[in-house]
């Protein structure tokens, strides 16, 4: 972890700590923990299963897609630091206001605001931030950062369930919002730096001949216009949209589904926690091994397993089947977002990574927020999740196949 010849710890590892905390709160706590609130929204505010997820889908359609594309360009122009800080402010504000909502339209409006914050503070800016600071050790650095996502996810269900029982869902939202703002604002202001060049450094802390290698490697970065005309770009976009859509469908409905299967809120939260503990194990494995194996093949295998494991939900009334699903699906989630940025960087370089990731993430966000809404509509119409889970399983496996067809080295060589 030491860089250059000075023996000092390379500052990029402090960037990894900042990214870890960002993933912990913005994705781990908010994305994976927020579905715990859905039961309260359904029981106390009268929302349907589709309505509790359609707010985020509307947010994606209204602001996520257009502002996501803008976020990528802004990151490349002004740096990830200020984009992340803006997003943190928006997410925190939306949660504080959500604690006062009483109507569906208020919920939907605040979901739009939260999605905008997620776009700025979430995967796009954080992945670009880490990718700019590392090259040779990019996979390991990204893996450590993504442990924040898994760690937040592990903590979130049980913690939020406790806060709701102890203080009510309104105060629980306020507590989560304040914690997010108190931690991420100081870290963003005093720790985060958008690029190593701001501190007179190079990726990985490289010096001398190693620095020359870094410079030469980045000259191979593909222009955005060239990249979007390649088969690889569309395979990554299509595959990640399907697989991450499957993840979103399960995560957003898992607790509601388990309640429908006869489990209590506390037991459902334990299953959700178990799933996310398994995802943490998957992230540790991927983070350790990703620089040693084919990134796109690893991504394909994990995505295929995501889809295949959903079949177990058909027998979820049996606790053993529910735990088996949580273990396999959770472990397979270890490659969900992280490998998207690594495979994209491997195919196209990093000079325009912000713009390319914005395009890809906005694409898979259609699945991430759209699939849960579709699953909710199916449940509201049929009063059963069976058809929804069958479609989700097919989507995940098809996503894995698409990623397997990516030919990273050949495509990059042709574009360079």
Question: PLM features: residue spans?
Answer:
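Extracytoplasmic
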Residues: 14-40, 44-49, 157, 250-255
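Hydrophobic core of transmembrane alpha-helices in multi-pass small-molecule transporters
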Residues: 24, 94, 105-121, 241, ...
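Extracytoplasmic gate region of multi-pass secondary transporters
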Residues: 30-39, 225-288, 371, 375
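Central cavity-lining transmembrane alpha-helices of secondary-active solute carriers
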Residues: 57-72, 273-285
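Helix-to-loop junctions at the C-terminal end of transmembrane segments
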Residues: 66-79, 283-294, 379-380
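Structural signature of the two symmetry-related core transmembrane helices
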Residues: 82-96, 297-311
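Helix-loop-helix hairpin linking two adjacent transmembrane segments in secondary transporters
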Residues: 149-196
């Amino acid at each position: 972890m030491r860089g250059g010849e000075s023996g000092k710890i390379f500052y990029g590892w402090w960037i990894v700590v900042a990214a870890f905390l960002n993933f912990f709160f913005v994705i781990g706590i908010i994305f994976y923990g927020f579905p715990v609130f859905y039961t309260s929204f359904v029981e106390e505010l009268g929302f349907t299963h589709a309505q509790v997820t359609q707010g985020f889908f509307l947010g994606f359609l209204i602001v996520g897609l257009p502002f996501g594309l803008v976020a990528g360009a802004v990151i490349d122009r002004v740096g990830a630091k200020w984009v992340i800080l803006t997003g943190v402010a928006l997410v925190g504000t939306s949660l504080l206001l959500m604690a006062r909502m009483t109507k569906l339209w208020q919920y939907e409006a605040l979901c739009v605001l939260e999605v905008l914050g997620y776009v700025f503070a979430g995967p796009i800016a954080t992945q670009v931030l880490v990718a700019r600071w590392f090259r040779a050790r990019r996979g390991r650095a990204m893996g450590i950062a993504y442990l924040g996502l898994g760690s937040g996810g592990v903590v979130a269900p049980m913690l939020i369930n406790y806060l709701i029982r102890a203080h009510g869902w309104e105060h629980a939202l306020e507590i989560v919002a304040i914690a997010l703002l108190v931690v991420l604002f100081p870290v963003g202001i005093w720790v985060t730096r958008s690029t190593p060049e701001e501190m007179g450094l190079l990726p990985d802390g490289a010096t001398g001949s190693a620095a020359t290698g870094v410079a030469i490697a980045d000259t191979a970065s593909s222009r955005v216009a060239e990249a979007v005309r390649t088969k690889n770009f569309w395979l990554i976009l299509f595959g990640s949209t399907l697989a991450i859509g499957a993840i979103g469908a399960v995560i957003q409905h898992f607790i509601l589904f388990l309640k429908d299967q006869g489990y209590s809120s506390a037991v459902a939260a334990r299953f959700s926690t178990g799933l996310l503990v398994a995802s943490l194990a998957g992230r540790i494995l991927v983070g350790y091994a990703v620089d040693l194996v084919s990134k796109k093949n690893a991504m394909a295998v994990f995505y295929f397993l995501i889809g295949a494991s959903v079949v177990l939900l058909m027998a979820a009334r049996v606790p053993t089947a529910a735990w088996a699903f949580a273990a396999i699906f959770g472990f397979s989630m270890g490659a969900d977002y992280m490998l998207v940025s690594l495979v994209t960087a491997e195919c196209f370089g990093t000079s325009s990574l912000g713009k390319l990731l914005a395009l890809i993430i906005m694409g898979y966000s259609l699945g991430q927020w759209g699939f849960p809404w579709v699953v909710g509509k199916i449940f509201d119409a049929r009063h059963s999740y069976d058809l929804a889970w069958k479609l989700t399983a097919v989507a995940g496996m098809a996503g894995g196949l698409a990623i397997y067809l990516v030919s990273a080295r050949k495509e990059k060589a042709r574009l360079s």
